[in-house]
């Protein structure tokens, strides 16, 4: 085979253990966010033809707005966005919101109204663009920048609009009877509940108000009693037959009935069923087949039936009996006398069909539509007297007015499905047919037909993503605005105004600001590492406005449901009160246009598994039989086994292979991104896997990232989609590289109008939201060929484009002197020495100089009463130098604030006038380093208000920025020149010129040498005879000039932005931000974890020579407790250890082969090793096609340890691990003999040793350790505050008091409760005593005692503190008590 392929070494190659082919492409992991918001803004859509959704729909629903008289109307025409003022980077630096101005075109139409006829004619039309505030834009990574911080809008899970049927599980009534209820939930508008009570009467409730009989609701819809009965019941016709009656026979009605008397055929008179026997379904069917038409009924059989129609005297119109009346002895008489030969009864048998609606109608006091409407009006607006008009209008507005009631397309679709209606999804209000269908379905449920709904089924819960949440919020803002517009239209002279004068866009802009700033779903992005970013964007929350609350959510809502499969991850959810309420989207899941989560399946046609992939929601999936992704498939593409394990209707069953019609696309489709990163997930207990998924999100990016030896193949996907690693936008060649930027010259799909240069700016040591460090490093060299999508730079926690959250370390599972008791972790000093788990954290400090009443604050180096030593790190402007090492208490920015003046004596005034200002008028308010923080200043930013003079430091920063912009411009210009002039010389060489620059002689073709004689800028003066070529030359020139000017214009715009003053909060003149970087090495007290939920705290760091070592003298890095595995059942960590050991062993072998090749020059053994290691299949790299150089490059990468991928649920088996261990020349038990580093003795038995991927978590002891001597006190109780952030003290709580009481340490206790806490006078005295060197003090009354007394007084109990001197008199002298 020709060795044609090259390997550039810029990506990590893994050996894949997965056996199941990947059929479907995994969707982009932040698609949920981006697609939703794009659909809302529709920036790309042409303005005229935008579909009615998102922002367009909001404007369409609120406009047109008419005034109260109908003389004018404001219509919406279109909207557009202008370019945002600042790009994302500038917004981050200047604390601004990344947003684009929204321009809306409105049309004001003024009408002339004819006073006599009332007809309207158009008088005037004006159109105008109106600015409607700024609309935040989403960055490429799916986040928003609000006031300079990155935020994520979390998607919300809520109950889908539509109709739901449920029962109370027998809880409401003591008899345990099931009371059924239906609820119609609109997207917005009034809820309608229809429910049974214990007496089987059907009631309706509107918006959880008082209940009314459902028949009143139906009457209000315009039905009368007879119509209601005929809607819900069939009619049964009894025909008089002499003294008896004939009843039609139907098998359906009589099956399962027990005969009380003989059943006799009305035609033949024979007995078809004797009394006391039961008619089975089969018997009923046989009788019907034999031709039994009717059976005989006596007059007594009429008793207990209900009339279906009124019985009326035709002559007088008098009603003898009403529809729904029950036939008893008295009414039977009337019936026999007045009825004709035919009587219609309601088909109610109290077995299959209950008389609930009929009973409700009888119980209902309302007789007519008017009564019913009045009744509903009284319930909804108690205390107001109803009139027919107001009652009708109110009832109409409740359910039938599109302004007030909106089912939404989803609600209509769900209703159609549940009630088997056929209504287009554009009808968004309720119809009377819908209400009748709801009541009918509810009654059928009560009769035992059909099933109740499962609220937790994902078919009944939908996702509201950013776009939709934003749409609702914006609609609220526009509605607030609409009221103001209406009022203004009526109060203003309408002929003279423009649309702009009517509109105040503040409410709309405020609604947007409020949503992004303070909504529960707008969250500060978790930016600890790339995985935590992605997970945050894919999160689904059941909390938030219109959702559940933690306290009210029961067990069912939080539980895993069968429909979660492939849609919501069953593993990843927080521990604690939010468990199950906050979930994560599964890897392949996507949200459809209705907001339901869909998951992909492969289609199975005629028993063959096809490559065709369909996405199904939970509702659509219910009727299918779905096979697992790991079902064995034979060579023909069919199932190998007769019976296949599959899922159907929420159950796992064995189904014959002919029935199976779908199959999972991938084994990892049921878990989320974080869970899919855990190798051997299938061998971990679910609770530990949950902890593993959650802790990976807390891993701190390390100084040297290292991809795991044992991965799952998801690593590159996360690194790419999170935006941490930079991917090339176009194919091209690298032109320049340094640490801060990469310049690539595009070689493909270069459009004439676009620039042919891509400049990628790398982020260097930027602070993330969690104070971790964002730093990107280039992976490419000048001259490298880059394909579109290649990774060209690594970011935080990525290594060659793979996610790298931790480090591979050599671990031994063994006890070590009790230092790994209770999950503690013992570390080797090598980890600290080699900076293996060292991370950089960046703290931001900000200081503002305000304009105060007493005069402006000033940022300066000239601070009163501060030694020169303390100012050593400040420059002349009073701002710390970059690179200064700072400690607690050091000044970062010098600032002075004017002090309040005390009135001056005339002498002082005189002295003041002679000698000028005196320094004591200002106090030092400099910003100092807080306690417990050390570090190096890495960046300083200075912001000035417009018109405030800039200091030297601000000018220097500005110059640096402009130089950087100029360099970008020059590079782009030089690449543009190179490209254009190369193209120009191509066009000219070999052609005959008819004109040229000065001194050019005509004749002969142009050559490269000839062109070289003239400067490039003069080449444009050559002209050729061929007109077509000449016009091409001119077009090239025009395009070149245009590009050049555009480039210069862009540069000028940016420079102008840099030089312009900054927008500041009111009263702020100047702001300085200082960034301090801290290097945090591993230390005892830091928390570490593996990927399997195996977490622990570092207990001790041991010198390398004392750690246990292997036979070759290698010391282990970390010792874990073997007892942490069996009870926790996370065996994945042991398998990972063994496999990691094998990877490292293989790496050693490859390293030896590389060294041999470098000495001897024979590559064959190395190539054979690599080819045997990475077999040829569609998931692995085609190493057999690599050229020699690529093989060496790949081997160098594998030398530290072979990287492998063991996908979840489709990973390496025990046999694979044994094979790898043997291939690496290691014992297949994975255990080795260890020696004690302190004595050199062998340990008693072999120990499991291997490589495990450990993470350093964000719970660092440096952030938690804290000490206080004197600090702030609480205002009311005068006790010290609590917590590190408040510089608080340690609470000596109730139990600690008990401990001191138990010891009898009375004085210590008194001290704790008084002078060390809230005895104000006492603690000042103690301080003074200590200063004097005296150690005696006296305790007084704690302030909290005074608070208690005050509180008791507020309850009316007068508590007074008696002075003890009254009781000092001896008892004998006390006045004697009266006898």
Swiss-Prot record:
One of its GO terms (molecular function) is DNA-directed RNA polymerase activity. Keywords: DNA-directed RNA polymerase, Nucleotidyltransferase, Transcription, Transferase. Signal peptide: none annotated. It comes from Chelativorans sp. (strain BNC1). GO terms for biological process: DNA-templated transcription. GO terms for cellular component: DNA-directed RNA polymerase complex. CDD domains: RNA_pol_B_RPB2. It catalyses: RNA(n) + a ribonucleoside 5'-triphosphate = RNA(n+1) + diphosphate. It holds the Pfam family RNA_pol_Rpb2_3. The gene is rpoB. This is DNA-directed RNA polymerase subunit beta. Its EC number is 2.7.7.6. PROSITE patterns: RNA_POL_BETA. InterPro entries: DNA-dir_RNA_pol_bsu_ext_1_sf (IPR042107), DNA-dir_RNA_pol_bsu_external_1 (IPR019462), DNA-dir_RNA_pol_su2 (IPR015712), DNA-dir_RNAP_su2_dom (IPR007120), DNA-dir_RNAP_su2_hyb_sf (IPR037033), RNA_pol_bsu_bac (IPR010243), RNA_pol_bsu_CS (IPR007121), RNA_pol_bsu_protrusion (IPR007644). DNA-dependent RNA polymerase catalyzes the transcription of DNA into RNA using the four ribonucleoside triphosphates as substrates. It is an enzyme of class 2 (transferase). The RNAP catalytic core consists of 2 alpha, 1 beta, 1 beta' and 1 omega subunit. When a sigma factor is associated with the core the holoenzyme is formed, which can initiate transcription.
């Amino acid at each position: 085979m020709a060795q044609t392929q090259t390997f550039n070494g810029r990506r990590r190659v893994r050996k894949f253990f997965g056996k199941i082919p990947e059929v479907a492409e995994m969707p982009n992991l932040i698609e949920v966010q981006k697609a939703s918001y794009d659909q809302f803004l529709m920036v790309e859509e042409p303005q005229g033809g935008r579909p009615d959704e998102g922002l367009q729909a909001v404007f369409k629903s609120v406009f047109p707005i008419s005034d109260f008289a109908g003389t004018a109307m404001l219509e919406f025409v279109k909207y557009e966005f202008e370019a945002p003022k600042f790009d994302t980077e500038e917004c981050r630096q200047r604390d601004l919101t990344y947003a684009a101005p929204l321009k809306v075109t409105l049309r004001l139409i003024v009408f002339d109204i004819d006073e006599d006829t009332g007809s309207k004619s158009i008088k005037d039309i004006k159109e105008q663009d109106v600015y409607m505030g700024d609309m935040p834009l989403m960055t490429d990574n799916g986040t928003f920048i609000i006031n300079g911080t990155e935020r994520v809008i979390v998607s919300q899970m809520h109950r889908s609009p539509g109709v739901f049927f449920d029962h109370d599980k027998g809880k409401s009534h003591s008899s345990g009877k099931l009371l059924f209820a239906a609820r119609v939930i609109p997207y917005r508008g009034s809820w309608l509940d229809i429910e049974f009570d214990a007496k089987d009467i059907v009631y309706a409730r509107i918006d959880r108000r008082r209940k009314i009989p459902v028949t009143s609701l139906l009457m209000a819809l315009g039905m009368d009693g007879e119509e209601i009965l005929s809607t819900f019941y069939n009619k049964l016709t009894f025909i008089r037959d002499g003294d008896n009656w004939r009843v039609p026979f139907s098998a359906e009605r009589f099956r399962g009935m027990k005969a009380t008397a003989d059943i006799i055929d009305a035609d033949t008179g024979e007995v078809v069923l004797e009394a006391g026997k039961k008619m089975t379904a089969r018997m009923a069917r046989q009788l019907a087949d034999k031709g039994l038409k009717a059976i005989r009924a006596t007059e007594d059989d009429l008793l207990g039936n209900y009339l279906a129609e009124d019985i009326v005297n035709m002559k007088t119109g008098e009603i003898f009996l009403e529809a729904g009346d029950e036939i008893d002895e008295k009414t039977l008489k009337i019936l026999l006398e007045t009825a004709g030969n035919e009587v219609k009864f309601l088909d109610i048998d109290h077995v299959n069909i209950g008389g609930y609606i009929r009973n409700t109608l009888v119980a209902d006091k309302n007789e007519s539509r008017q009564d019913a409407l009045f009744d509903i009006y009284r319930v909804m607006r108690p205390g107001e007297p109803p009139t027919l008009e107001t009652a009708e209008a109110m009832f109409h507005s409740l359910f039938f007015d599109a302004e007030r009631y909106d089912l939404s397309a989803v609600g209509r679709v769900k209703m159609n499905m549940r009630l088997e209606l056929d209504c287009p999804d554009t009808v968004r209000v309720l119809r009377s047919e819908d209400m009748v269908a709801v009541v009918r379905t509810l009654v059928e449920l009560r009769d035992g037909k059909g099933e109740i709904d499962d609220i937790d089924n994902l078919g009944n819960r939908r996702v509201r993503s950013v776009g939709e949440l934003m749409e609702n919020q914006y609609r609220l803002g526009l509605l607030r605005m609409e009221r103001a517009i209406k009022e203004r239209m009526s109060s203003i002279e309408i002929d003279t105004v423009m649309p702009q004068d009517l509109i105040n866009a503040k409410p709309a802009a405020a609604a947007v600001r409020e949503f992004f700033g303070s909504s529960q779903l707008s969250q500060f992005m978790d930016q600890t590492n790339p995985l935590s970013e992605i997970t945050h964007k894919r999160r689904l929350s059941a909390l938030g406005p219109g959702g559940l609350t933690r306290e009210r959510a029961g067990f069912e809502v939080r539980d895993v449901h069968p429909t979660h499969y492939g849609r919501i991850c069953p593993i990843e959810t927080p521990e604690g009160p939010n468990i199950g309420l906050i979930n994560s989207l599964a890897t392949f899941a996507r949200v459809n246009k209705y907001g339901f989560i869909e998951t992909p399946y492969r289609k199975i046609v005629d028993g063959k598994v096809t490559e065709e992939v369909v996405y199904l929601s939970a509702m659509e999936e219910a009727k299918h039989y779905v096979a697992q992704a790991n079902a064995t498939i034979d060579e023909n593409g069919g199932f190998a086994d007769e019976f296949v394990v599959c899922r159907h209707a929420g159950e796992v069953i064995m189904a014959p292979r002919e029935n199976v019609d779908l199959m999972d696309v991938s084994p990892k489709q049921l878990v989320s991104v974080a869970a899919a990163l855990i190798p051997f997930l299938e061998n971990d207990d679910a609770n530990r896997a949950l902890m593993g998924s959650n802790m990976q999100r807390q891993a701190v990016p390390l100084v040297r990232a290292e991809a795991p030896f044992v991965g799952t193949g998801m690593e590159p996907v996360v690194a790419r989609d999170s935006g941490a690693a930079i991917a090339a936008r176009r194919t091209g060649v690298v032109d320049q590289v340094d640490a801060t930027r990469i310049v690539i010259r595009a070689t493909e799909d270069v459009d004439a109008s676009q620039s042919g240069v891509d400049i990628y700016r790398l982020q260097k040591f930027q602070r993330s939201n969690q104070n971790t460090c964002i730093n990107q490093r280039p992976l490419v060299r000048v001259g490298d060929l880059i394909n579109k999508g290649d990774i060209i730079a690594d970011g935080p926690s990525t290594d060659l484009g793979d996610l790298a959250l931790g480090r591979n370390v050599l671990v031994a599972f063994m006890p070590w002197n009790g230092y790994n008791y209770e999950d503690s972790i013992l570390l080797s000093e090598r980890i600290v020495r080699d900076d293996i788990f060292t991370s950089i954290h960046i703290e931001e400090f900000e200081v503002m100089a305000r304009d105060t009443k007493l005069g402006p604050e000033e940022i300066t180096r000239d601070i009163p009463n501060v030694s020169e030593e303390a100012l050593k790190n400040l420059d002349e402007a009073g701002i710390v130098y970059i690179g200064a090492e700072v400690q607690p208490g050091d000044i970062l920015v010098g600032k002075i604030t004017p002090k309040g003046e005390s009135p001056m004596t005339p002498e002082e005034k005189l002295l003041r006038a002679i000698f000028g200002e005196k320094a004591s008028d200002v106090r030092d308010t400099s910003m100092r380093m807080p306690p417990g923080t050390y570090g190096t200043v890495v960046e300083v930013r200075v912001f000035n208000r417009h018109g405030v003079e800039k200091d030297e430091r601000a000018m220097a920063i500005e110059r640096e920025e402009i130089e950087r912009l100029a360099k970008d411009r020059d590079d782009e210009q030089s690449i543009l020149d190179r490209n254009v002039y190369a193209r120009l010389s191509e066009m000219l060489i070999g052609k005959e010129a008819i004109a040229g620059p000065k001194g050019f002689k005509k004749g002969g073709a142009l050559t490269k040498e000839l062109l070289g004689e003239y400067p490039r800028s003069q080449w444009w003066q050559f002209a050729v005879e061929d007109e077509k070529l000449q016009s091409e030359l001119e077009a090239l020139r025009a395009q070149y000039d245009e590009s050049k000017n555009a480039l210069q214009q862009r540069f000028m715009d940016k420079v102008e932005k840099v030089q312009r003053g900054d927008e500041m909060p009111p009263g702020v003149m100047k702001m300085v931000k200082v960034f301090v970087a801290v290097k945090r090495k591993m230390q005892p007290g830091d928390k570490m974890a593996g990927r399997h939920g195996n977490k622990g705290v570092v207990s001790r760091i041991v010198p390398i020579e004392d750690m246990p070592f292997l036979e070759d003298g290698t010391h282990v890095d970390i010792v874990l407790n073997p007892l942490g595995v069996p009870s926790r059942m996370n065996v994945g960590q042991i398998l990972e250890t063994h496999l990691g050991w094998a990877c490292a062993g293989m790496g050693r072998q490859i390293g030896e082969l590389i060294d041999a090749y470098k000495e001897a020059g024979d590559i064959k053994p190395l190539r054979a090793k690599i080819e045997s290691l990475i077999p040829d299949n569609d998931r692995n790299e085609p190493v057999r096609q690599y050229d020699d150089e690529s093989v060496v490059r790949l081997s160098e990468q594998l030398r530290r340890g072979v990287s492998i991928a063991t996908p979840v649920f489709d990973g390496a088996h025990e046999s694979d691990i044994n094979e790898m261990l043997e291939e690496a020349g290691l014992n297949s038990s994975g255990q080795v003999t260890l020696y004690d580093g302190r004595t050199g003795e062998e340990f008693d038995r072999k120990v499991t040793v291997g490589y495990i991927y450990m993470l350093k978590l964000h719970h660092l002891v440096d952030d938690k350790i804290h000490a206080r001597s004197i600090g702030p006190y609480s205002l009311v109780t005068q006790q010290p505050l609590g917590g590190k952030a408040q510089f608080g003290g340690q609470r000596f709580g109730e139990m600690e008091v008990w401990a001191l009481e138990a010891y009898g340490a009375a004085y210590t206790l008194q001290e704790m409760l008084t002078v060390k806490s809230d005895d104000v006078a006492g603690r000042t005295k103690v301080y003074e005593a200590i200063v004097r060197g005296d150690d005696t003090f006296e305790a007084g009354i704690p302030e909290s005692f005074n608070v208690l007394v005050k509180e008791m007084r507020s309850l009316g109990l007068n508590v007074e503190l008696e002075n003890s001197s009254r009781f000092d008199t001896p008892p004998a002298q006390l006045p004697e008590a009266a006898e």
